[in-house]
Amino acid sequence: LKIKPLYIYLFYILAILLSLYSMLSAPMPFTVNPFMHILVVFFAYLLSFLLIFLLSLLVSDVLKLIFRLKRKTHLSILISLTTLLFLYTTINAFCIREKETQIQLPHLTKEIKAVQLSDIHLGHFRGENHLRKIVNKVNELNPDIIFITGDLVESHYNSDKQTIAPLKNLKAPIYFVDGNHDAQVGVEKLKNNLREIGVRVLENEFVDTLGLRIIGLEYMRPNKQTSDPLSVAERKTIQSIMPTIPVLDTMPTIVLHHTPLGSEYVSKAGADLYLCGHTHGGQIFPLTLINDKNFVYNRGLYKKGRLQIYVSQGSGTFGIPLRLGTNPEISLLILQSSL
């Protein structure tokens, strides 16, 4: 099968741009510089456009083969598809939807309306105004409790006190656990800033509220066999920490952790609900298909014996500001008694 030279050129260009973008967008203090910010945004959208162009080229070439399209028609389809897809994916990346899910829990004495926020990724593409919009949307839902399951920030740019300040306007108690990107930026500083505005940061501990036991885990590996250089505490694993935190049979237990890994240890401990994020649902088709293979729990609600697992697609994006085949979400979880 002969590959068109254009595809080869595009792959080379994308590889070079991806390398440059990875260096420019690395979570280093110098990226706070306004000039660096402009460079990061420019390369991100250039990379995004070329990815969409490559996908559109592939689709239009397949259509050309099937329907024997003339060159002019083929070119028109390519231009139209590239334009529409680029506009849709870049706009969709910032259009946050409320996704409601009903979850049955044992020993629950009353219905609880919970909101889960995950993977907001404050940084070069999202700042204080974006977070304020999320806060307003959450307040409109009138939740009883709010969980933030990591990756609140992704860059030194837009990760200061002022940027996260809108969170103090949330009208329900907030519980936070950190993610891998929080660790890259400086997790202790972020945690202290959150505490100052009234957010309860959970570090391998529990709190009882609303008839629920909430366990919050730091970002960590599921077990010692798993390698992860970004793990906050190298000696800690979900396998080693979960047995040290009491789980009661008389009230529902919810465990917060950034990634859906380690669910077997959460299940073994006797927890009822595991709230996670990290995956973004794959974020961009066809990466969504790869993510479905890489993560047993990629997006939405799953059941593993007694344990239910909810994986949020996140409210932001990782890397480039595109969403295709997934939607940024605010997860509205209606917790109801299973009895």
Where are the language model's segments positioned?
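Non-catalytic terminal accessory segments
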Residues: 1-94
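Soluble catalytic domains of enzymes that build or remodel membrane lipids, polysaccharides, and related
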Residues: 104-339
